[in-house]
């Protein structure tokens, strides 16, 4: 039985990734996230069916212990904006630093392991119809995007087996989960549901050889960001997360 390790399992995409892996019925699954009230509540439902662990991707010793025993790794852990863009070192520590620990462990202990890495399409900025070959230009305050781009470069230069998914705005329940809410009201944005995003990671395992050493833009539809916020207000009412989406309306989105 192949072994799959999921980092960032308590997030909107992570939860559904675990569900889809279980539905396949052919994997031994280990999941990890930071231990807090929210992650404990969201992951406890899986404790009888998967190996549930709590820890930090910046813990090099822990990463080495976990990586050496798995065939596939799905890396979803991230310092999401706006938090990830508030301090220059935060995204580099979590997104890049965690990725660096995993890449190092794979090279040293498990070079056949295949890494599926969650990156972001927000690095494209205002490029029309971007492709994975589009030239990326970031400013000095794009901490989150920079950490993802540097992680991609590290993966491509060091690993033999990897697949990178650049993920657009993820549609999730803003009352229960982190809402990826950064954007300009007039922008048309590529979007994907949390379910479709998770499914792409899980199905990718079956086609790892075909997808190896490739980068993909994920999306299922395009939507106007202002219209999306209006619909969320209509459906869910006024919430703190909706207010945050308004406060940071001129920022880049994840």
Regions found by a protein language model. Name each.
Residues 126, 139-163:
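Active-site Tyr-X1-5-Lys
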Residues 51-97:
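NAD(P)H-binding glycine-rich loop region in Rossmannoid oxidoreductase-like domains
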Residues 100-143:
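Conserved Rossmann-fold NAD(P)-dependent oxidoreductase catalytic core, especially the SDR/UDP-sugar
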Residues 149, 172-182, 194-195, 204-216:
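Glycine/proline-rich active-site loop of Rossmann-fold NAD(P)-dependent oxidoreductases
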Residues 203-254:
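Mid/C-terminal beta-alpha module of Rossmann-like enzyme folds, strongest
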Residues 58, 90-101, 138, 142, ...:
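Glycine-rich NAD(P)-binding loop of the Rossmann-fold in SDR/ketoreductase-type enzymes
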Residues 124-125, 142-143, 163-182:
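Flexible, glycine-rich beta-alpha linker
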Residues 4-24:
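N-terminal Rossmann NAD(P)H-binding glycine-rich loop of SDR-like oxidoreductase domains
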């Amino acid at each position: 039985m192949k072994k799959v390790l999921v980092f960032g399992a308590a997030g909107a995409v992570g939860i559904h990734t675990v569900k889809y892996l279980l539905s396949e019925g052919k994997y031994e699954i280990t999941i990890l996230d930071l231990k807090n009230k929210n992650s404990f509540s969201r992951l406890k439902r899986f404790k009888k069916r998967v190996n549930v662990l709590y820890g930090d991707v910046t813990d090099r010793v822990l990463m080495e212990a976990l990586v050496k025993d798995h065939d596939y790794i799905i890396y979803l852990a991230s310092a999401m904006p706006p938090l990830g863009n508030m301090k220059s070192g935060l995204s580099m520590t979590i997104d890049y630093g965690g990725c660096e620990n995993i890449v190092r462990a794979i090279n040293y202990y498990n070079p056949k392991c295949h890494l599926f890495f969650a990156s972001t399409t927000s690095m494209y900025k205002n490029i029309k119809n971007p492709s994975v070959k589009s030239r990326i230009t970031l400013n000095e305050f794009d901490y989150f995007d920079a950490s993802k781009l540097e992680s991609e470069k590290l993966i491509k230069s060091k690993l033999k087996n990897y697949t990178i998914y650049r993920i657009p705005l993820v549609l999730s329940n803003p009352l229960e989960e982190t809402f990826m809410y950064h954007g300009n009201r007039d922008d048309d944005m590529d979007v994907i549901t949390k379910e479709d995003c998770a499914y792409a990671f899980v199905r990718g395992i079956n086609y790892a050889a075909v997808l190896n050493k490739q980068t993909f833009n994920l999306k299922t539809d395009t939507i106007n960001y202002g219209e999306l916020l209006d619909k969320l207000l209509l459906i869910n009412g006024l919430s703190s997360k909706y207010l945050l989406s308004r406060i940071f309306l001129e920022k880049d989105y994840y």
